[in-house]
Amino acid sequence: MTDFVFIDSGVGGIPYMMRLLEKKPDSSCIYVADTANFPYGEKSHAQVIKCVTELVGKIRERFAPKVIVVACNTMSVNALEELRSNYSDIQFVGTVPAIKLAASVSKKRRIGLLATKATCENPYNLELKEKFASDCALVTRADGELVSFIEHNAFTASREECMKAVKPAIDFFRAEGCDAVILGCTHFLNFTDVFKAVCEPDIRVVDSVDGVVRHALEILGSSFEVLGSEPPLVDFKGVSPLRREGSGKPQVCSEGEPSPSLFITGFRDTEEENQYNVLCSRFGIQFGGLLSK
């Protein structure tokens, strides 16, 4: 069996896997990007459920995961209950907007949520707000263009290009008087340092990485000790500081796959396939290629 399988519409959720490996390097981990159905953020509720359910079926057969981390806010808020119902033999950990954390750091009581259209429009956000931030105003911004930019350009664009891509969203939240912005799409985590450079010092940037990883580790009986309030998760070019110099012999899943590995479900052309190879090289993980049906 594989300890953890991470799923997302693209490569945005990789920082979750890298953070878990920083905490527990001997874990067997597989990352599956459903690139054939990217982007998820513009799909209907029913479409998201259909795509994710089919994806998990393939993953279950191929990797026999103990835990699946749904490293995608859109997948989580739309399909998590369905997945738990359909695959009761697998433990699922979802990712949802870090509204509670944002409320704890906001002094103005105005919180920004940057996410996909599907996440922004999901009523679950209102439930989270009423439960954890009832005295705060929640300002949302759907930015599918930024998600697409990160998926296809994050690891080749210059820092200046990345900051230019992020700036319109932050200008919007600044004009709305927000002093905390939630990165409500896992793709944005690859740009954490870029967001901070554009936001700080007047706007705090928050995400759900440590909370999700803590939950995933606890399911398999491991503890999470916070190394710092703002750990060096992934630097600008997408290279985990831990993995940059290597971390010894790779783990192997019981199915024989090297761990950690990245699999995709489709690509547009050879150039795009090569981009995934480059990405894997920078993260220090194996590229498994296409996930077979």
PLM segments and residue spans:
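Non-catalytic structural scaffold of enzyme domains
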Residues: 1-236, 246-293
